[in-house]
Curated annotation (Swiss-Prot):
GO terms for cellular component: mitochondrial inner membrane. It comes from Adalia bipunctata. Component of the cytochrome c oxidase, the last enzyme in the mitochondrial electron transport chain which drives oxidative phosphorylation. The respiratory chain contains 3 multisubunit complexes succinate dehydrogenase (complex II, CII), ubiquinol-cytochrome c oxidoreductase (cytochrome b-c1 complex, complex III, CIII) and cytochrome c oxidase (complex IV, CIV), that cooperate to transfer electrons derived from NADH and succinate to molecular oxygen, creating an electrochemical gradient over the inner membrane that drives transmembrane transport and the ATP synthase. It catalyses: 4 Fe(II)-[cytochrome c] + O2 + 8 H(+)(in) = 4 Fe(III)-[cytochrome c] + 2 H2O + 4 H(+)(out). InterPro entries: CcO_II, CcO_II-like_C, CcO_II_C, Copper_CuA, Cupredoxin, Cyt_c_oxidase_su2_TM_dom, Cyt_c_oxidase_su2_TM_sf. Cu cation A2 binds at C196, E198, C200, H204. This is Cytochrome c oxidase subunit 2. The keyword Oxidoreductase does not apply. Residues 49-62 are mitochondrial matrix. Its cofactor is Cu cation.
Length: 228
């Protein structure tokens, strides 16, 4: 999550967010070029001394401003389509994490392992230590291995929720009676925070998400310890 003195994007914790940032820069560059060209044309038209009172048509100009926007949209659409298919693609996941939203906490199930399921509640102010983030810390963190393809399944037991980790570029709705899925890969170790991003009731602001990314070997040790 964004913290103090932060006005830019978060440091990427997944390959997906890196691609989304590249696309953002690509689209922003094109938009800046369009804005500059339009501003230059408007200023030059306003401050020059040329006029044509009887100008009724200009086929050349109309052809130019029809073809150029078409090519511009193509240059924006192609990377966008690539990202859409990249987000939806599920390829040989090593870990499947099922997330169930409740009012107002999360339940996590590791479908690849037996007896590995827990609830995750926000820590109250009295239980925080000086190094915790207020409204973002939970009693049970979600443990995931880095450099591993992770399949995320989401659903809800009551109303619509949204499971979101901004630094990983992950945002997926958790709808009652429906199972949604997406995949992502964490590219480094660390602790990454998120929150429910769909207004789900009075305590919507108090159902945070906390992911702890660790090495695959330590993940296996944690699974063996938690499954006992």
């Amino acid at each position: 999550m964004s913290t103090w003195k932060s006005s830019l994007f978060l440091d990427s914790s997944s390959f997906l967010l890196e691609q989304l940032r590249f696309f953002h820069d690509h689209a922003l560059l094109i938009l800046n070029m369009i804005t500059g060209a339009v501003a230059y044309i408007m200023i030059s038209l306003l401050f020059n001394k040329y006029n044509h009172r009887f100008l009724l048509e200009g086929h050349t100009v109309e052809t130019i401003w029809t073809i150029l926007p078409a090519f511009t949209l193509i240059f924006i659409a192609l990377p966008s389509l690539k990202l859409i298919y990249l987000i939806d693609e599920i390829r040989n996941p090593l870990v499947t994490l099922k997330t169930i939203g409740h009012q107002w906490y999360w339940t996590y199930e590791y479908s690849d392992f037996k007896k590995l399921e827990f609830d995750s509640y926000m820590l109250s102010y009295d239980n925080l230590n000086p190094f915790n983030f207020r409204l973002l810390e939970v009693d049970n963190r979600t443990i995931l291995p880095y450099l591993s393809n992770i399949r995320l399944l989401t659903s809800s037991a009551d109303v619509i929720h949204s499971w979101t980790i901004p630094s990983s570029g992950v945002k997926i709705d958790a709808s009652p009676g429906r199972l949604n899925q997406m995949s992502f890969t964490l590219n480094r170790t660390g602790i990454f925070y998120g929150q429910c991003s769909e207004i789900c009731g009075a305590n919507h602001s108090f159902m945070p998400i906390s992911i702890e990314s660790i090495s695959p070997s330590n993940f296996i040790k944690w699974v063996n310890k938690s499954s006992l």
